[in-house]
């Protein structure tokens, strides 16, 4: 197995690199703890170069996001409760207490993300309703058209 696509997923994980996005086969957008990284790496094992970008209202990436190629850009979502469960676990593991896991913060981030998805006119995948394997098939079919 050639791991170059896994290396690509690692290098482009969590918005670490926002240049040369045309090299990516797939671009995933979503709030923190929505499932971008597991989906990215799973797709990497299937020979896809995946970049994932966290959507944080304070980062104000709207103009940059408008330049993304829509045919390979996908929005990810989950319920507030699902994201909150993952964020509370993360806070506990890190020994911190912040507004990162509050329902209000998560709701605001989801609203921001969905506004971006609507502006970009991209497909939205609910990872509460679709396993990463199913999401991979869905995305693969969309990008191979």
What are these regions (language model features)?
Residues 3-13, 98-135:
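Small-molecule kinase domains that catalyze NTP-dependent phosphoryl transfer to phosphate-bearing small molecules
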Residues 54-55, 123, 141-145:
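Terminal helix/beta-alpha structural elements that buttress the NAD(P)+-binding lobe
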């Amino acid at each position: 197995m050639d791991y170059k696509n896994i290396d690509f997923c690692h290098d482009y994980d969590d918005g670490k690199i926002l240049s040369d996005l045309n090299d990516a086969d797939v671009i995933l957008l979503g709030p923190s703890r929505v499932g971008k990284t597991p989906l990215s790496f799973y797709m990497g094992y299937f020979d896809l170069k995946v970049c994932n970008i966290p959507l944080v209202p304070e980062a104000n990436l709207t103009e940059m996001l408008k330049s993304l190629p829509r045919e390979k850009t996908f929005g990810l979502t989950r319920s507030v409760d699902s994201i909150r469960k993952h964020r509370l676990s993360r806070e506990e593991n890190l020994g911190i207490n912040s507004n990162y896991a509050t329902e209000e913060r998560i709701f605001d981030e989801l609203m921001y993300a969905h506004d971006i998805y609507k502006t970009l006119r991209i497909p939205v995948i609910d990872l509460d309703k679709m396993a990463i394997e199913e999401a991979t098939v869905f995305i693969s079919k969309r990008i191979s058209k």
